[in-house]
Amino acid sequence: GRYSEIPREMLESGDFVTPHLNYVAYFEKPVLHYWLTALSFEVLGQNEFAARFFPAVLAMAGVFVVYWLADRMYGPRAAFLSAWILATSLVYFAIGQINITDMPLSFFMTLSSAGFWMGYRRDRRYFVLFYLGMALGLLTKGLVGVVLPAGVAFWWIVLTRKWEVVREALYLPGLALFFLVGTPWFVLVCMKNPDFFDFFFIQEHFLRYTTKMHGRFEPWWWFIPIIIVGSIPWTGFLPGAIASALPSSIASRTRQDRGKIFLLLWFGIIFLFFSISNSKLIPYIVPVMPPLAILMGSFLDLNMDRGKTRSLGM
């Protein structure tokens, strides 16, 4: 596929700024995924294993980030359950073996959201991960890698009224890292290719999202059955996990409820964003799986303590 051919042509030509597909400039996606695959080809050879290597590695890395975050939010048992649920969920497991940009994007968005939460709860320096994840997401799939993590953080601050987090999150080293990592390639590719800006930001962002130009239109509810099937074998726990997070989150502002609000927003904003879009593909929904896994893992952990695991099917 093109995600293997473009890196191969990069290695052949030595041009690591302008992606080419069949020796024609190709601007549908940013460059990071091509760079990672080219590195894999250079080290492991140009073969199928090398092409799939980095998506698989980043899928596993996403599992570890979910464990880390869930451990800090709910404890080690919930962390283990969350990580196990994520690693074995059908859609996450499947997409992690395919050489496309969606799993890398999911990992960088997960890293960003985890960095935001840890920056708020533990140490301001973790906000560096918030900005680094957005920068790498930007280089992987464009503005979606910034808009969604930033949107989750923004709406969480609004709903919880934690206005002081705005000042804390505007962390100068993190902001500097974002621009240092995320912007140089865009400057270089625009200098070499004056038509890049219009094609990439107007056609591939605004028009792809708001029109049916790519012929990938589906109804707004299309991702609901994808999530249901994609959560197999854990689908049965989804309704309870989401329902148990809703009432207390709305009713109070305790530390635990702020965590539930954060996870629900993380899931809900990504889900709504892609559901509204006029361009839909199954892999787009992968980034909702990490917050869903933590919701389900913490739900199971809580019900184990209450002795309800038998009624939950365990």
Predicted regions and their residues:
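Membrane-integral, polyisoprenol-dependent glycosyltransferases
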Residues: 1-310
